[in-house]
Amino acid sequence: MLIPMLVVLGCALWAQRYQRGVADFLSAGRVGGRYVMSVASEMAGMGLITVVAATEAYYRSGLGYAFWEMLYLPVGFVLGLTGFCTYRFRETRAMTMGQFFEMRFSRSFRVTAAVIQSVSGIINYAIFPAVGARFLIYYLDLPGYVELGGWALPSFQLVMALFLGAALLITLLGGQVTVLVTDCVQGLFSYPMYLLILAFILWRFDWGTQVMPVLSSGEAGHSLLNPFEIENLRDFNAFYVFVGITGMFLGRLSWGGTQGFNSSARSAHEARMGNLLGTWRAQFYKWMSVILAIAALTYLHGRDFADEAHELRRELAS
């Protein structure tokens, strides 16, 4: 885990030399190709909290929700092939959403949008690093407190500070240039890791004798296997899928977290091709989350893992 972090920070320091002006800081000099854009932009939208949230959704709803979520794929292809929003946004030559708002509406609209985005971003950064920090503490079995200079410091706050500090360091070193390079490097690291995780889970759990009995043991009308019973699920159901598809149209290019990637491509055509390729690449992450959720269901509810599951629940409750 430490080696990839050092490699990413090294790439950030190396890429800093290419940051020479405002266009480089905000839009990476508009030099991104389709392959770099497809990897980096998808990686920018994925974090520990994203993995936790997706795994929780599949854990609660099973393969039924995963089946209907496949509708996102053709919708993503249509949006990518048509260049929906991409061409019109690049025609404005705006480098940020704020600049676009001022050009399209007014300066007061830009200020209002900036205030809303800043407040929501502060709230966002109070939740996202907290979830990621909690995950790493359990994953690495870190102690609750660390002795430092006679002070007992909570590991939770230290890991959160590490997350926030790393994000600020990478961003401030070279702006969108370093973000584009480091996200691309992280994406290249992640794909073989996805395959290793999938291979380990498929090797560790037997599908016929361990996985299927758990998936088929759901309540009547709330099957974890039958996609046509999804309307009976409480949280991640057909309405949730419909809202997600609607959001793909209404929220196109609007998320502030990846606004720098909207203007970083070499041309509008390269941006369109990057979005199209990114739709394919996102399936790696999606199915890794599905398999992780199935593994968690099997481990926590399977008869073969009853003792281990009891110990895990006791540890999480303590």
Give a label for each model feature.
Residues 1, 30, 44, 171-172, ...:
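Short conserved micro-motifs on helix faces and helix-strand junctions that flank
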Residues 1-23, 95-98, 102-137, 160-219, ...:
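Membrane-interface loop-to-helix entry segments
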Residues 5-22, 37-55, 73-95, 168, ...:
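Juxtamembrane transmembrane-helix boundary signature
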Residues 21-22, 28, 85, 97, ...:
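Glycine-rich, flexible loop/turn motifs
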Residues 26, 40, 167-168, 176, ...:
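A generic hydrophobic-helix recognition signal that picks specific residues
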Residues 27-36, 53-68, 102, 143-156, ...:
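Loop-to-helix junctions at membrane interfaces in multi-pass transport proteins
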Residues 43, 66-172, 243-251, 260:
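Helix-loop-helix module between adjacent transmembrane segments
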